[in-house]
């Protein structure tokens, strides 16, 4: 393990949106793997903690998030996935979050989103960005190998269940989730896929997801899941919400989205959710950071809402 001084220098460099060298990324990912392999599918988290949704390579908005919410390690953070793709700075964004995780392992929890996958990143920008910035795909491989180790969900004080997407018809209890083998590419279907892809819906029961992966789940499903598992709330990300957060399903579920003006054109606010020492909840909304000059990109990423 390198000394914290080395890591601190790397974090300082990354905070200026300057990517690490390829060799440093490899070492960083190896260190992160050693930490994440010890974490759980349902990673326990203590309060106070600030819960964050999708970032999607919007580096300067991540810096704005830290400005609003407080810097690590002064503030404990829980990120619910989707660090890469879409935005211009996926490399710098994921590098910074992983470096902070290695430096302050008990202060930062980083979960897996549906974009933390080999297949999705080859289509929606991260793979191309790695090629453009490093001249080869090695850094993409280091990070996508690391993504396999990210916890799938987190549980704040046994009360607030956090994950990227949503529930699964295959998983009635947290113990079902604990028994999954997560260290693999995100499958096309099945319980692990559902946790990263599903969405809440106005209709009751389970529905076919328009995304082509995961399911939609109704208020009846969320209420029963929370009751069965002694939960007060499901906190998830995965969907653009214009105010940055959105309560649904009789406040059994909240969506938190932390990429303001998503894709640099959606006009939405972002939000983060502060959970205090007595489990009190406070949403902080924020607008985009001042726009930087956009880098040239090799090709336009496809339009879609995943």
From Swiss-Prot:
The keyword Nucleotide-binding does not apply. Its EC number is 3.1.3.16. It comes from the Eukaryota. The modification Leucine methyl ester is found at residue 306. GO terms for molecular function: metal ion binding; protein serine/threonine phosphatase activity. Mn(2+) 2 binds at residues 82, 114, 164, 238. Reversibly methyl esterified on Leu-306 by leucine carboxyl methyltransferase 1 (LCMT1) and pectin methylesterase 1 (PME1). Carboxyl methylation influences the affinity of the catalytic subunit for the different regulatory subunits, thereby modulating the PP2A holoenzyme's substrate specificity, enzyme activity and cellular localization. Phosphorylation of either threonine (by autophosphorylation-activated protein kinase) or tyrosine results in inactivation of the phosphatase. Auto-dephosphorylation has been suggested as a mechanism for reactivation. PP2A consists of a common heterodimeric core enzyme, composed of a 36 kDa catalytic subunit (subunit C) and a 65 kDa constant regulatory subunit (subunit A), that associates with a variety of regulatory subunits such as subunits B (the R2/B/PR55/B55, R3/B''/PR72/PR130/PR59 and R5/B'/B56 families). Interacts with TAF12B. Interacts with SRK2E/OST1. Interacts with TAP46. This is Serine/threonine-protein phosphatase PP2A-1 catalytic subunit.
């Amino acid at each position: 393990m390198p000394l914290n001084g080395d890591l601190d220098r790397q974090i300082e460099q990354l905070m200026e949106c300057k990517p690490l060298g390829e060799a440093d990324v490899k070492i960083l990912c190896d260190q992160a793997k050693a930490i994440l392999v010890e974490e759980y599918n349902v990673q326990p988290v203590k309060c106070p903690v600030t819960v964050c949704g999708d970032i999607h390579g919007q580096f300067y908005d991540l810096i704005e998030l830290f400005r609003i919410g407080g810097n690590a390690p002064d503030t404990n953070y829980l990120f619910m996935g989707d660090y890469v793709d879409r935005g211009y700075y996926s490399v710098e964004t994921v590098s910074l979050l992983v470096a902070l995780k290695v430096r302050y392992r008990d202060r930062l929890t980083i979960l897996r989103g549906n974009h933390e996958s080999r297949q999705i990143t080859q289509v929606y920008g991260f793979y191309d960005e790695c090629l453009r910035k490093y001249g080869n795909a090695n850094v993409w491989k280091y990070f996508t190998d690391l993504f396999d180790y990210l916890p799938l969900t987190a549980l704040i004080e046994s009360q607030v269940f956090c994950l990227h997407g949503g529930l699964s018809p295959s998983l009635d209890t947290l113990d079902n989730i604990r028994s999954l083998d997560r260290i693999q590419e995100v499958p096309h279907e099945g319980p692990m896929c559902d946790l990263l892809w599903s969405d809440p819906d106005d209709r009751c029961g389970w529905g076919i997801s328009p995304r082509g992966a995961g399911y939609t789940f109704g208020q009846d499903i969320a209420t029963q899941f929370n009751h069965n598992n002694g939960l007060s709330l499901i906190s998830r990300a995965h969907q653009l919400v214009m105010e940055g957060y959105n309560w649904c399903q009789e406040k059994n579920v909240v969506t938190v989205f932390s990429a303001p003006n998503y894709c640099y054109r959606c006009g939405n606010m972002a939000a983060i959710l502060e959970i205090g020492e007595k489990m009190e909840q406070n949403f902080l909304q924020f607008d985009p950071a001042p726009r930087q000059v956009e880098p040239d990109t090799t090709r336009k990423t496809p339009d879609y809402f995943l």
